[in-house]
């Protein structure tokens, strides 16, 4: 593919796991109309996504939120969902994996001047159909069916799993380090050191 360059990339029609905008589309077809859909992209800033998601979920009318991303944005999608689960306790989660079909069109680069080549010759093009993995994570304040695949119950202990370590206090120059106490430091005997230097 070194002699080709990508001209365009488009979502293939029909048969793909659409993230569509209408009701009944996407991986969670039975969502309430007030659910928020966050489309996470590769260039999205997590702080911007989280600010909007947290503000949306703080409203009593919002009962569910869906984070969806595909390709290189899947890790960012998981990160957003995990941050929101830590900020808001008691969220039920359902995770769905799907694939999107993407058609890429590549065009050959014009070769250098060679003998026998016609200057107006059209460039060859190549079409590639790729299945790009995508992830959709539903977080809901309401209980969900625990028998459906990808279900995770709310975390019983919100927050970090272990308490943060207490910061070590600074010591004065004259104080011994922790664990040294008042023990004497071993010093060489005066006679032994003199013998080593004279030898």
UniProtKB/Swiss-Prot annotation:
<dbReference type="InterPro" id="IPR002775">
    <property type="entry name" value="DNA/RNA-bd_Alba-like"/>
</dbReference>
<dbReference type="GO" id="GO:0003723">
    <property type="term" value="F:RNA binding"/>
</dbReference>
<feature type="compositionally biased region" description="Pro residues">
    <location>
        <begin position="151"/>
        <end position="166"/>
    </location>
</feature>
<dbReference type="GO" id="GO:0005654">
    <property type="term" value="C:nucleoplasm"/>
</dbReference>
<dbReference type="GO" id="GO:0001682">
    <property type="term" value="P:tRNA 5'-leader removal"/>
</dbReference>
<keyword id="KW-0819">tRNA processing</keyword>
<dbReference type="Pfam" id="PF01918">
    <property type="entry name" value="Alba"/>
</dbReference>
<dbReference type="GO" id="GO:0005730">
    <property type="term" value="C:nucleolus"/>
</dbReference>
<keyword id="KW-0539">Nucleus</keyword>
<feature type="modified residue" description="Phosphoserine">
    <location>
        <position position="182"/>
    </location>
</feature>
<dbReference type="GO" id="GO:0034451">
    <property type="term" value="C:centriolar satellite"/>
</dbReference>
<comment type="similarity">
    <text>Belongs to the histone-like Alba family.</text>
</comment>
<dbReference type="GO" id="GO:0000172">
    <property type="term" value="C:ribonuclease MRP complex"/>
</dbReference>
<dbReference type="GO" id="GO:0004526">
    <property type="term" value="F:ribonuclease P activity"/>
</dbReference>
<feature type="modified residue" description="Phosphoserine">
    <location>
        <position position="172"/>
    </location>
</feature>
<dbReference type="GO" id="GO:0006364">
    <property type="term" value="P:rRNA processing"/>
</dbReference>
<comment type="function">
    <text>Component of ribonuclease P, a ribonucleoprotein complex that generates mature tRNA molecules by cleaving their 5'-ends. Also a component of the MRP ribonuclease complex, which cleaves pre-rRNA sequences.</text>
</comment>
<dbReference type="GO" id="GO:0033204">
    <property type="term" value="F:ribonuclease P RNA binding"/>
</dbReference>
<keyword id="KW-0698">rRNA processing</keyword>
<feature type="region of interest" description="Disordered">
    <location>
        <begin position="144"/>
        <end position="199"/>
    </location>
</feature>
<keyword id="KW-0597">Phosphoprotein</keyword>
<dbReference type="InterPro" id="IPR051958">
    <property type="entry name" value="Alba-like_NAB"/>
</dbReference>
<dbReference type="InterPro" id="IPR036882">
    <property type="entry name" value="Alba-like_dom_sf"/>
</dbReference>
<feature type="region of interest" description="Disordered">
    <location>
        <begin position="1"/>
        <end position="28"/>
    </location>
</feature>
<feature type="compositionally biased region" description="Basic and acidic residues">
    <location>
        <begin position="1"/>
        <end position="11"/>
    </location>
</feature>
<protein>
    <recommendedName>
        <fullName>Ribonuclease P protein subunit p25</fullName>
    </recommendedName>
</protein>
<dbReference type="GO" id="GO:0030681">
    <property type="term" value="C:multimeric ribonuclease P complex"/>
</dbReference>
<keyword id="KW-0694">RNA-binding</keyword>
<comment type="subunit">
    <text>Component of nuclear RNase P and RNase MRP ribonucleoproteins. RNase P consists of a catalytic RNA moiety and 10 different protein chains; POP1, POP4, POP5, POP7, RPP14, RPP21, RPP25, RPP30, RPP38 and RPP40. Within the RNase P complex, POP1, POP7 and RPP25 form the 'finger' subcomplex, POP5, RPP14, RPP40 and homodimeric RPP30 form the 'palm' subcomplex, and RPP21, POP4 and RPP38 form the 'wrist' subcomplex. All subunits of the RNase P complex interact with the catalytic RNA. Several subunits of RNase P are also part of the RNase MRP complex.</text>
</comment>
């Amino acid at each position: 593919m070194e002699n080709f360059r990508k001209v365009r990339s488009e979502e293939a029609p029909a048969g793909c796991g659409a993230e569509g905008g209408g009701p009944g589309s996407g991986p969670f077809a039975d969502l309430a109309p007030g659910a928020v859909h966050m489309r996470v992209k590769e260039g999205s800033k997590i702080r911007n996504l989280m600010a909007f998601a947290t503000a949306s979920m703080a409203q009593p009318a919002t009962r569910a939120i869906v984070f969806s991303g595909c390709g290189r944005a899947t890790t960012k999608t998981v990160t957003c969902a995990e941050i929101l689960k830590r900020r808001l306790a008691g969220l039920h989660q359902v995770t769905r994996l799907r694939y999107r079909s993407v058609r890429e069109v590549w065009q050959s680069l014009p070769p250098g001047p060679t003998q026998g080549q016609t200057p107006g010759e059209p460039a060859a093009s190549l079409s590639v159909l790729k299945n790009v993995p995508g992830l959709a994570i539903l977080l809901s304040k309401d209980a969900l069916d625990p028998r459906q695949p990808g279900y995770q119950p709310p975390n019983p202990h919100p927050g970090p799993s272990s308490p943060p370590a207490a910061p070590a206090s600074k010591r004065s120059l004259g104080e011994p380090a922790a664990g040294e106490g008042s023990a004497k430091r071993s010093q060489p005997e005066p006679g032994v050191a003199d013998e080593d230097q004279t030898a």
